[in-house]
Amino acid sequence: MDVTYLENVPLDGPFTELELHWSGESSGPRFPLTFNQRNHLAAVAASGRPTWIGGTLGIPDGVPLSTIAGAVRSVVGGADALCAVACGDDQQEFTADQLSVIPGEVRPDAPAAAELESLVAGRCRPGRVPGLFFATCGDVLLFGIDHFHADMLSVALLQRRLHDALHGRALPGAPRFLDTVTAPRPAPDDAAIGVWRRFLDTTGNRIPAFPVELGVAGPAPASPVHDVRRLLDDPGQCTFAVILAGLAEAVEPLSGSAEFPTVIPVHTRGRRGDERHGTVGWMVGNAPVIARAGDVETTAGWLRDAVTVAGLPLETMIRECAPELPDGAVPMVSYTDLRRLGTPLPQARYVSATSPTDTVQFWFSRTVHGLDLRTKYPDTPEARQVMDGVLGGLERALGGKSLSPGR
């Protein structure tokens, strides 16, 4: 699966939206909204901008639209997180029986990039029905999901289920997302809180902003720059610790510090082998890491601690530690080893919304083809100059040294 943006996806051939229709209203038991979902709904309400994620998948030759629509219905109906909507402070499901998927008008070509982005964004927003979008374009199935419903791993899970359904294979079962919402929560973990306190002691009890000025004036974020590149064709032993130590080395000449404190997303599906790894839903927390320029061992130690922090709800950390939050978005460094998800699927890509930003976000992904990086940062002269230096320095740091094992 390539991690990119919709604007970079080649879409050729007839275009048909697979329209999702939900009869009646959501019903049944109510479940509490998660911390991520509440924050997401508040952000969308404040900005008016939906935040969606999604993907593409190759369609086998000769599969009719009716079969594709049936596959979409079975996959969506089988994932409770995709059938739920917010109801006040709770969420409530539609049933699979309330869903029908009907192929819409066939257009000779895909909409222009801006029009397609607008179409997906219009469908993938919180409302009375789930925020989902599906369409075919030539031999590609494209889908988008309001972030309320899912995370990046969910996109990969959905691609595999759609692939199986299109080939007539039975879909695997998995624990329901809404059951995880109501599962008993353990008491605050002293070790996990201790990791956060050690991090915050270093940062002055602040969740750090990006350490270099990016030239974003005023409270409004700037239009984004999207950079997608292959860093290494043969990463060898280039683990996340090596990457972070290299990133800290690239930032050091600009920040004046060998330490690069940041926050990384960590899934909350348990350790490898836990059946929750098959659950579709937004199951991501955050962990603190202090990467040190060129120091893989120290950086790897923080990543080991991130495993300890993974199960700690972020709201618990905020209540216990009361850190100062940055004015804008929190910078983020994400790493996913996509080789662990199985054999690569045809034309599988991860895409997400393009929205204004006032910080820098890095998505590193390891595939059978190498180490890739998707970066988003503000489109300002200052940020362009900074990121030219950072990305160039990162390429030199990773390509110009012996890569030491780490986590």
Go through the PLM ranges and name each one.
Residues E93-L99, I145-F148, T375-E382:
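Secondary-structure transition/turn motif
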Residues M1-S47, T51, I59, V75, ...:
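Acyl-thioester-dependent acyl-group transfer interface
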